[in-house]
Regions:
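Extended acidic, low-complexity intrinsically disordered regions
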Residues: 1-470
Length: 470
């Protein structure tokens, strides 16, 4: 475990020198090549990753500081070993205490709620080739005939090492259909996962899971019927941040757009050269908007984040399950009003209203947004008046739900309370679909966003136009 309040200033893992006149690196420095120590220190920590893997050691990083500490460089050994990362402001905070207690949670037998020194081996039928894995694992570079020449993430192997294994560990494996011979539709193929792990003092355990599937024809309706758009979005997000580690953000966005156009062209129903005829079935309809919010997310657009924050965001996304990943990609938004119980609303600027409260969950932070009328009534103390009991209950409801969200999640998300038009409202506005901007025809009093970003509707119109081209 590493507990730090600042970056390394000496040694091979040096992040910044001790001269206070030199600022720590930013994303602009990384892009322009002006981050003096970044490449050297990153290489040092990558070499450390292999040593940790060989010794089956897990590295946890607890960083509490108002500035960066070098998490971007240290990310490699933390991620590959399956370690925990926390970025906070103070070691005296409840956030730090909760994260530390979480690490040492144990069962009724006194064993930690995690397994160590794990390996996952994959065995496939001859028509399926293994490309690699993305997640908290390391390739053991053990090749056989089922390993593809194409590598994705930790590839070139059919066996991976995991320093730690919990009930929330999530790894994405990638496969390629072999083209040596044409497979026959209706015939079966198998993928087997063989997992070894050490469970407390109870020795080594072995678990074998075998999945069987049938081959179908290229244009079979079963392909569409079996498509899981939520899981697909989660996997594409991991692929996108994997690409973002090696390419410029604009190139990653272009890659995502090209993949989405191919997807829409293949699975959409349309008359060629007629965008108005374009339709996607219910199994595919949400996928384009997932990609819209992914390309706008902090995982790809790093403009408002430090390198340490970006490393933290990407590390968590790369190990989170489908549900958590979707919240990171497309946050949830609930509306509280006098009209009834809370309801989910569109992640759109039009959802902001003076007489409602919004509860926004982006996984990393939770925002309670008070409309201007609600805020004014609260400042006048109406919630303390027995004659306005319904208003008091309205104020309490989102706070109770927000506390539950914060209590269930580790690392602990930041809780932000803000008023409409207040400075803290930017945390919500930055994630909303800008359907109304400063360039729109809007009515007086309507909420709008100052931005040059395209709205979801404009994005979909362009997608439809490109998908139906010959």
């Amino acid at each position: 475990m590493v507990f730090t309040s600042g970056p390394a200033t000496v040694g091979p893992g040096m992040i910044v020198d001790s001269d206070l006149g030199n600022a720590i690196r930013t994303h602009r420095d990384l892009i322009s090549g002006h981050a003096t120590y970044y490449k050297k220190s990153s290489e040092f920590y990558k070499q450390l990753s292999q040593r940790l893997c060989d010794a089956s050691i897990v590295l946890d990083l607890f960083a509490c500081s108002l500035d960066q500490v070098g998490a971007a460089e240290i990310k490699a050994p933390v991620e590959s070993s399956g370690g925990f990362m926390m970025l906070g402001e103070s070691f005296e905070s409840d956030q730090f205490r909760k994260c530390l207690r979480h690490i040492f949670n144990h069962d009724e037998d006194g064993n930690l709620k995690m397994c160590f020194d794990a390996t996952i081996e994959i065995v496939t039928t001859k028509d399926v080739k293994i490309c690699g894995a993305l997640g908290p694992c390391v390739s053991l570079r053990k090749k056989n005939s089922s390993v593809s020449e194409k590598e994705i993430g930790e590839g070139g192997t059919n066996m991976w090492k995991l320093g730690i294994l919990t009930n929330k560990t999530c790894i994405a494996f990638f496969y390629q259909v072999g083209d040596e011979q044409k497979v026959q539709a209706g015939s079966a193929f198998f993928i087997q996962f063989i997992t070894h792990y050490r469970l407390g003092n109870m020795g080594i355990r072995k678990r074998v899971t075998t999945a069987a599937r049938r081959w179908v024809g290229n244009h079979s309706p079963e392909i569409a019927a079996g498509f899981d758009q939520e899981a697909a979005a989660s996997v594409m997000a991991r692929l996108a941040i994997h690409e973002a580690e090696r390419r410029y953000a604009r190139d990653v966005i272009r890659w995502l757009d090209n993949m989405l156009i191919r997807f829409a062209s293949k699975f959409g129903d349309y008359v060629q050269e007629d965008p108005s005829s374009f339709r996607l079935s219910s199994n595919f309809s949400l996928y384009p908007q997932f990609m819209y919010y992914l390309r706008r997310s902090q995982f790809i657009d790093v403009f408002n984040s430090s390198p340490d924050e970006t490393a933290f965001f990407r590390l968590l996304l790369n190990r989170e399950g489908v549900v958590g990943s979707l919240i990171m990609i497309q946050p949830t938004l609930f509306q509280y009003s006098f009209d009834g119980p809370p309801i989910p609303v569109l992640l759109d600027v039009c959802s902001i209203s003076p007489d409602v409260i919004l509860l926004f969950d982006s996984y990393f932070y939770v925002v309670i947004h008070y409309g201007s009328k609600i805020s004014q009534w609260r400042k006048l103390g109406y919630d303390k008046d027995p004659n306005h009991e319904s208003f008091r209950k309205l104020l309490e409801a989102p706070e109770l739900d927000a506390e539950q969200l914060v209590a269930e999640r580790v690392p602990v998300p930041k809780l932000i309370k803000c008023d409409q038009h207040g400075s803290q409202a930017r945390f919500l506005l930055a994630k909303l679909n800008p359907s109304v901007t400063q360039n729109s025809m809007y009515t007086d009093g309507a909420e709008f966003i100052f931005t040059d970003d395209v709205s979801l509707q404009v994005f979909m119109d362009h997608l439809q136009a490109l998908a139906v081209q010959g």
